[in-house]
Amino acid sequence: MKKIINNPDQFVDEMVEGILLAHPDQVRTPGDDRRVLVRVDSPAPGRVGIVTGGGSGHLPLFKGYVGKGLCSGVAIGNVFSSPSVQQCADAAKAVDGGAGVLFLYGNYGGDVFNFDLAVDLLELDGIETRTVLGCDDVASQPKERAKDRRGVAGIFFAYKAAGAAAERGDSLDEVAAVAQKVVDNTATMGVGLSPTILPTTGAASFDLPEGEMEIGIGIHGEPGIHRGPLGTADEIADQILDSVIPDLGLGEGDRVAVLVNGLGATPLEELYLLYRRTHQRLEELGVVIERRYIGEYATSLEMAGGSISLLKVDDELLELLDAPAQSPFFREA
């Protein structure tokens, strides 16, 4: 294992400290617990707060999307581990400006359990909440069980749209409805080429022989749907799109936003090869590509591989995607 770290047990805390030192104009800690970060201007009276959270190891997910026009706060867990109930509640309290708080995070058992308990604590304090779960990973469950799918890179679209809705003054129910609309129209699938090495143990998160790939792998190394010889960029994109396109029922005249995401150790050049084939496939179908995002949006430490997310859009969602936003890891002018 080769990593640029100090004490593995302090990996997350030192990383958070680095973010705070590098971006004091955008994020801050509301209290003594540095596992809770909020926008520097939170709380804002009358503005709906949006709180996300989850395990570390996925930057810029989750903590990298705290900022203007995005999330208001984040609860930070250890690597691949859920934040505590108290951290989830503290993040919500710190961003509540009287308009309520939307919890928007990926659909993972530990996160759901702790955030749900935080909702109970917040009710005692009179803070109104709503919850929307990112569940865009089409490999994790069939279409008829879409609400049980894992949340992966496609949650970026929900952050962006819901954050813009909150910024323009929408109510809590309206912001939650925007987030749910995005979730209902987003589909993602990934491919893994090499495992993540956990900083605390030095152990690989899964085994993948040299020369093989795994289609549908999760961002924690959860098993995919197909393992076999490494394909070409076009073959990989086709395998992913053969699941993602029909999942959304895309056809001629439909409009989409495309996100090609790197998982941590994949060169940007290779992501553009995946985008190239994605563009070709959608163009052949007569699907209009309205927006394109290529880069690292949800990683898994140094896992090699990538994912393709498609969001079916309309005029409302495009307006929200184009609204100004700024966080340590994302900017929309």
Where are these regions (language model features)?
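C-terminal non-catalytic interaction/assembly regions of soluble proteins
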Residues: 243-333
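N-terminal amphipathic/basic leader segments beginning at the initiator methionine
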Residues: 1-50, 315-333
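Short alpha-helices
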Residues: 133-185
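Short, acidic/small-residue loops that bind anionic groups at enzyme active sites
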Residues: 74-79, 123-148, 284-289
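Glycine-rich oxoanion-binding loops at beta->alpha junctions
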Residues: 58, 62, 67-98, 245
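Mixed-charge interfacial surface used for oligomerization/domain docking
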Residues: 168-273
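Short glycine-rich or small-residue beta-strand-to-loop segments that form or flank ligand, phosphate
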Residues: 2, 48-55, 71-74, 78, ...
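Short Gly/Thr/Asp-enriched flexible loops that form oxyanion-binding sites at enzyme active sites
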Residues: 112-126, 145, 270-276
